[in-house]
Amino acid sequence: MATGRIQFAVSTPCNTKGKPSGYRLFEFKNDRLALVPSERGCTKVDVNANIQAFCYLRPNGRDTSISPDATHILDSCDYMVLAKSNGFIEIISNYQYKIKNGLRLAPSYILRCTPEDFESNFFSDYMIAGLEYSQGLLYCCMCSGRIYVFVMNLPTDYIQYKNMYNPMFPDCFFKVHHDNNTTHSSEEEKLFEGSTRYTGRSCSKHICYFLLPIEPSHLRSSPVVSSFCNMYQGLPIYRPSMYLHIERGISTFHINPLDRFCFMTVSPRSPLFIRKIILPLTYVTFLSTFISLKNSIQGDTCGEILSWDNVAQQNGFGSLFSWISNKFTFDTDIINSTIWDDIVKYSGTGMLDSGIVWKQRQGHAKDDIYELFHTQDMLGSSRRNSSFSTASSEPRPLSRRRRESFQALTRDAFRERMDVPCSTKWELDSFIRGLRRNTFMVDFEIVEKISHRNGNDGVNEDDNTTDESDETMTSFLTDNYKKMDIVCIDHFVTLSAFRPRYYDEPIIKIDSLSNKNGSENGTNEEEWAESQMKVDGQVIDDETAQFKQALGNLCSFKKLFMLDDSLCFILDTHGVLLINRFEIKNTKNLLRNSKDTIRIIPHDFGLINDTIVIINDIDVGTDNVCALTFHLVVTSMAGEITVLKGEFFKNCRLGRIKLCDSLKLNRKDRFVDKLALIDYDGLNAQKRRLDYDEKDLYTFIVKKVKRD
């Protein structure tokens, strides 16, 4: 049975200097992958700049339609947001309408990430860790730790489309309840909420209505911006509403679904953080004053005021900020504060701080890494081996011992015992803490625990009867956080789950160190497998052996998708893993769990860049056992875009997957990188045929890849 239409975008960076990068649109239908012809905007802006992140916005539960020029209340058009390595963010409105009608996909609005990052060189590239939208705030988080926040003028039902489509279990992700959010909001946040409510649509009240354009004099004086502003054909370039700077090396970023002023970050050698933006009254007062001033001056007049300093001078003030400061002279504390000085210095961008409200406890848990180094046999072997060499028993500097230990740590070290010569307990524990900090997270998802679950969720006490007076609980993590779980995967094939409301350590952790080698008690495992064979026959034994082999081949987790609050869909370079985390009874030996708890599909994906998951069908039985059918869209370092169809069956540890279609780049100076899901019709979508001219396909230069 053919699947519904899947439409997605793929970024195509170019590694040749002086040539443009960009992105392409593809459609998968009737088991065929085809290029969607589209006309892009000016390609000069893509020279020496590539797309780092997509963010596709559309109303939730409503059909999209083109926005008319006349004034109307509700916005129904969709927006594609493209964040580029040169620090510019393009917003394309009426995106699907333009695709269907063959219109140019030129940006309608331009954002600029400023202050610029000049730490590495003058024309520094922006490495983006995350581009996300939630409840009117667009976050752009750089790997350098710089976070730019833009206040968008959108209705409350607008959401960001994720790279997963799963209509079967929509209740495992937090819904936005504005009443609950304002209950625990500060006075500054309530004032911010009242000042930035959706205004309706007109020719002037667009998506960037709350943003301040960069002054033309600043555009001319900035060498980075001035080289691009002419290419955007006179479009206003808007500056961020807020800016903050955290530690460097951010690898993953997500907005807290319970609080739009709160976000979560992960970086190598650092734990998982939940941070809260500190919103000062000075900045909120400035923003609300500017918006009210804009309402009175601009009104419903078409066109954007490009220079507010010129308007201020026409009204007898030296600049916009002297005009605004004149409106709240009754409060001299605002004008005399350092926050106001920063607002003036950075031309209307608030330089804000953030506070850590929760932090993962890292480096002290007695997990499999701890047990690996603290077994008596290993320590005894170390003492015996030290007697064969007088040099090994001589005192040596601590730094040398640690250096040699780290150099000896290879992938084979996880499969055999290691020699730690003459290490005392505190030295060994210090080494283990350093090792564990290197097993950093590569991806994490936030889900809401469904209360009717009966499985093992990692919490012994009832959530409703927990003593709220516990001094160890963070006051910020209110009752709304009782059902929040953060599920994580790290580079060394480990799955962890946190419940920040109660713990700073994982409530469940599946470590590959013991499972790759089978179990700590090999004899018991063989006896157990033999008993299973006697009961169920030889077929089950073969499946168990194949399952063990496939599990041992896993080497690097890449992507995590939560199908519901328990089902973890993990993509590894050597297969697909489906874990029902609430049903796991034995984390030390995965074979001792039921067949439907942990399932795997062996497949060699190669070096994965990005993935889209489409869940076609889920059949859940009364015992919470499910059969699953899905489609995968994968981009790889080999320059391929691959679409595969996979299945997981009931009462079977092994699934199967097959190649549907694949396209590969012929050009050696380009590769395929980021993906963005745009549309999916579903299995009962109306069938229609799209014809493409060969001249449209020539612009991408692709070839079919045939496989057995």
Swiss-Prot record:
Subunit-structure text: Interacts with core components of the GID/CTLH ubiquitin ligase complex. GID12 binds both the substrate receptor GID4 and the tip of GID5 in the scaffolding module, sealing GID4 onto the scaffold.
Described purpose of this protein according to its UniProt entry: Regulator of the GID E3 ligase complex. Modulates both assembly of the substrate receptor GID4 into the GID E3 ligase complex and its activity toward its substrates. GID12-binding remodels the N-degron binding pocket in the GID(SR4) complex, and could limit substrate accessibility of a bulky substrate to a ubiquitynation active site, thereby stabilizing gluconeogenic enzyme substrates. Involved in actin patch formation.
Gene inactivation effect: Causes a decrease in the number of actin patches and concomitant accumulation of upstream components like coat patches.
A biological process term (GO) from this entry: actin cortical patch assembly
Protein's UniProt name: GID complex associated protein 12
Biased composition (Low complexity): 381-396
Additional free-text comment from the UniProt record: Present with 339 molecules/cell in log phase SD medium.
Underlying gene: GID12
Organism the protein comes from: Saccharomyces cerevisiae (strain ATCC 204508 / S288c) (Baker's yeast)
Renumbered residue ranges of the record's region Disordered: 381-403
Taxonomic lineage of the native organism: Eukaryota, Fungi, Dikarya, Ascomycota, Saccharomycotina
